[in-house]
Regions:
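Transmembrane beta-barrel strands of outer-membrane/channel proteins
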Residues: 32-36, 105-111, 188-192, 232-236, ...
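Hydrophobic, lipid-facing positions within transmembrane beta-strands of outer-membrane proteins
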Residues: 12-18, 34, 86-92, 107, ...
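Structural signature of Gram-negative outer-membrane beta-barrels, strongest in the C-terminal barrel
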Residues: 21, 27, 33-35, 84-87, ...
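Gram-negative outer-membrane beta-barrel transporters
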Residues: 181, 185, 326, 332-526, ...
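C-terminal beta-signal and adjacent terminal beta-strands/loops
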Residues: 326, 339, 346, 453-455, ...
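Solvent-exposed loop/turn elements at secondary-structure boundaries
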Residues: 200, 206-209, 213, 217-419, ...
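Repeated loop/turn-to-beta-strand initiation elements of outer-membrane beta-barrel proteins
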Residues: 27-30, 101-103, 183-186, 226-228, ...
């Protein structure tokens, strides 16, 4: 448990880098680089009052107890962070020039470690509510009774995620830059990546080996005088599962709600005279929708042994043409296609059904299920998996008393068996056009225009349409119903982007610069209860996994992502730098104005359409992000 500290908001970063280059012979060069970084970060609100609960939903307190005036307090927060991140990296390259070939071999290793990452809870949290129906259908019953006909209740929320973890990234690669002719260069390469993720006790939950990434590229000096160049490349790129997957995943965490009716409220807002609301799923005590009860995680079950890391293929073809000695025209086509993704799946009932298992008990946040042969095994709430692929899930066997036997049962299950009607999809296509006038000692300018489309059902490792940053553990793919009708334009899709920048030396000491960026709007999604037009939203079928207003249907219709857009935005920045000759131009005094016109267009809106079945959320389409306001920055630098 964290406590108040003298310096509640603290961040310190230490970086050390060493580099070596050795020219062993005229044709053999060895280069090596080693670096370390340590980041200390502490965020503990000093205004948090020890021993005083953080309250929520106080307007739902029973007026028969409060007299119609909510009982509250001055508590301002409940959680804190006190973490340290460390990374060590080493890269070694050996380059050998052999005739028209430049051969390079190397290693690229990085180790990331995080200590006490996540957040801890400092005080109790109590949230008040009211309903005459079941609080959590299928799990927690109704608080209503003859003595509480209006269904007033309160629940105690516990949310603790602080843990430690590590990630090892190791790679080796080979490259041949082959100057086939004087004006044609061919690059051939291959890279092998190995990623190992470990939880707080050092257990590896993902150990991905032999991830081969081929690369090929070329550059053609068409006329042999650098007046026109055609270039292209194709390659595969792997992305490691990030460290924070261990938070609320491979490491133990607690996220529970314990529901009570009450007969009184203390002066600090804590409910008193508590009676537990009955569970309807056979359990008792706190309820966690994802099974986060603070119990140890079975890492062999958490991540399938054949889990593949996220990777995509990229293809680029472009050309550059010198229109004049000082003006270049360029064009580039880009195509990226996501081939595999990693996310969490949190529908244990669908998993058990696909595996031919029947739940018979519930213990320590896990289901106990039997197969057709009567064998008993543990089934957790959430598992990492490859959406659209097949994975081998490993279940720990238990005896008749639910004690582990030390053996496991492996079952291969496809995404289709889990109910998904589509695999992972993400394609990005773009055409870039640009005019570049390089700096000649007096002025320079560049204009870029990009036409692009980003479509699919998976943005990547985050879900930015409503700010979900749980990397590789987003709401997407938690259950099949959440992904129905999800294909559309992704949150990072911008159809048109125009960027202009330039600088001009007014005198030998004064330089003025400017940037203009005009961007078309971002896609707007709509999330509601699951009702494509033929489902009663009061029916459990409208919220099959208990996520509330989180499905791609709104107001009885399918809501294709990107059917609406935020407005276009325009940003103008200006800069002025003075370098007096008196100081040999080592002194620079700068003035920068960002967003000169102070445009405040909406860049993101709330996409949740309902707070309850057939109840429109008053915050739906409310702006939650605007362009940053105009700022003026004054700076002084000195180079020596």
């Amino acid at each position: 448990m964290l406590t108040a500290v003298p310096d509640p908001f603290y961040q310190k970063n230490e970086i050390n880098i060493a580099k070596y280059t050795g020219y062993l012979t005229d044709t053999l060069t060895l280069s090596a680089m080693y670096g370390e970084s340590t980041l200390h970060k502490r965020q503990i609100n000093p205004s948090i009052l020890p021993g005083v609960p953080l309250l929520g939903g106080v307007t739902n307190q029973n007026p028969a107890i409060t007299g119609g005036t909510p009982i509250t307090n001055n508590q301002s927060g409940a959680v804190g962070i006190n973490a340290k991140d460390k990374s060590k990296g080493m890269r070694v390259d050996l380059e050998w020039v052999l005739g028209r070939h430049t051969l390079t071999a190397g290693i690229d290793n990085i180790k990331f470690e995080a200590f006490n990452e996540g957040q801890d809870q400092l005080v109790d949290r109590w949230i008040y509510g009211r309903t005459t129906g079941n609080i959590v259908p299928g799990h927690v019953g109704s608080p209503a009774s003859p003595s509480n006909p209006n269904g007033y209740y309160a629940y105690k929320l516990i949310f603790k995620t602080a843990t430690s973890m590590s990630l090892d990234q190791k790679a080796y690669y080979l490259e041949d830059r082959w100057q086939i002719t004087d004006n044609f260069l061919l690059s051939l390469g291959i890279r092998n990546d190995k990623f190992t993720n470990k939880n707080n006790v050092g257990e590896a939950y993902l150990d991905a080996k032999n991830q081969w990434a081929p690369r090929i590229g070329f550059s053609w000096d068409v006329n042999g005088d650098a007046s026109m160049k055609v270039f292209g490349n194709a390659g595969r790129y792997f992305l490691a599962l990030p460290n924070n997957v261990a938070i609320r995943g491979a490491s133990a965490s607690t996220f529970t709600r314990e529901y009570f009716t009450y007969t009184g409220i203390a002066p600090d807002g804590t409910p008193t005279g508590l009676t537990p609301v009955p569970r309807t799923d056979g359990g008792s005590g706190p309820y966690s929708s994802n099974g986060e009860y603070g119990t140890p995680v079975d890492v062999k079950a958490f991540a399938p042994s054949d889990l593949k890391n996220m990777y995509q293929d990229e293809f680029i073809l472009g050309m550059e043409k010198m229109l004049t000695p000082n003006l270049m025209l360029g064009a580039k086509l880009t195509h990226r296609s996501l081939k595999a993704a990693v996310d969490d799946f949190c529908d244990p009932y669908a998993l058990m059904d696909a595996a031919g298992l029947t739940p018979v008990d519930f213990q320590n946040g896990k289901f106990i299920a039997t197969n057709s042969g009567g064998n008993r095994m543990e089934v957790a709430f959430c598992y990492m998996f490859n959406p659209g692929g097949s994975n081998t899930y490993s279940f720990a066997n238990v005896d008749a008393s639910n004690n582990p036997t030390g053996t496991r049962t492996d079952i291969k299950i496809s995404s289709a068996q889990l109910g998904f009607d589509q695999g992972v999809k993400r394609t990005y296509v773009a055409l870039d056009l640009y005019l570049d006038r390089p700096w000649d000692g007096k002025w320079e300018a560049r204009i870029d225009y990009t036409f692009s489309k980003s479509r699919g059902n998976t943005e990547g490792q985050v879900k930015s349409e409503f700010g979900q940053t749980n990397i590789s553990k987003t709401q997407d793919w938690d259950a099949a119903a959440l992904m129905r009708y999800s294909y559309g334009y992704l949150a990072n899709d911008r159809r048109h982007q125009l960027k202009m920048r330039g600088s001009y030396a007014i005198t030998d000491e004064w330089l003025v610069s400017g940037n203009v960026r005009i961007v078309s709007g971002a896609p707007i999604s709509c999330l509601g209860y699951f009702n494509p037009g033929n489902i009663d939203e009061n029916d459990p079928a409208a919220d099959p996994v208990g996520y509330g207003s989180s499905y791609h249907t709104c107001f009885g219709q399918i809501a294709t992502p990107g059917s609406q857009r935020t407005p276009w935005t325009k940003t103008i920045d200006l800069g002025l730098v003075y370098r007096p000759a008196y100081f040999d131009k080592k002194l620079a005094v700068g003035l920068n104005v960002r967003n000169l016109t102070n445009d405040r267009k909406v860049t993101q809106v709330d996409v949740t359409s309902e707070t309850a079945p057939y109840t429109v959320d008053n915050n739906y389409l409310r702006p939650i992000a605007l362009q940053p306001p105009r700022t003026v920055q004054f700076s002084v630098t000195y180079d020596w």
